[in-house]
Amino acid sequence: MKRKTKLDKKSKWVLDMKFGVSSLVFLPESLTSSMEKIAEHNFDAWEIVCEGTHYLSPKNIKYLMELRDRYEVEIVVHAPFSDLNPASMNERVRKLTVECIRDAIEGAFELDSEVVVVHPGYIPELWSNYVSEILDNNFSTLSEIVEIAEDYGIKIGLENMPNFRGVLGITPESLLEIVKDIDSKNLGITFDIGHANTAGNPAEFVEKLQNIGIGIIHVHAHDNNGYDDEHLKIGEGNINFIEVLEKLKEIGYDGVISIENKNIRDAVKSKEILKEYLEIVNEKVAEKEKIEE
């Protein structure tokens, strides 16, 4: 029997978080097969990664609208990234990046999604001595993407990246450097807990983002041991998820947490564990409020 919690009273801290699962769990499976598994395992949302068979073509968008309505699953969109680079020194690559992300934004609009996740650019080894130019390119491309998002009423969630050589947007400070000159309410951060763990303490990462005034609008969850982007099941790495969830509640986050594991079995287990952790956090908060009354 599930234990009861002291959460019946209204609380500014007790906020509902929804648990989603990423296309990364399913690719290259079909949309139908993926959605059936999502519904079977009671995920609240599906983060569609616009790659391969899950690219948001007009045909796929129409079909996803039917699946979404049939299974009553919320859709979040992750823009394509594998062959693209918003910071590229090649103008044609930057233009292609914008057009592909435009497809994701338009698809998100059709699917009633609020957020499109976007990766910042990276510095190719050939251009490692041209960081200033790379950053300028990244700014120009992201600015154009945000303008498109504003036209559709979509929010762009710029994702923090793992601590790999040449990657932009690894730390809160580097994210600030990217977004500081883009004045738009349609731009925020997709906080990737696993990526943050390769760059330090994920809970402190949340606090730093809050302190420098960058809002978290979406969250990715997976585990690792701090050295590589392993996408392990929750509990198999060294991340203190209870501490991270506490920080997310402190800043008032009540959106989707998308689970990014390597298979559906791990994703389902991760969801179960995260729900248990969230219950623990809620109980701690309720007890704290009781003491303060």
Swiss-Prot record:
* Biological process annotations from GO: DNA repair
Domain of life where this protein originates: Archaea
Q: Name one Pfam family in it.
A: AP_endonuc_2
Question: MF terms per GO, please?
Answer: DNA binding; zinc ion binding
Family the UniProt entry places it in: To M.jannaschii MJ1614 and MJ0008.
Supply the name of the protein: Uncharacterized protein MJ1311
Give the originating organism.
Methanocaldococcus jannaschii (strain ATCC 43067 / DSM 2661 / JAL-1 / JCM 10045 / NBRC 100440)
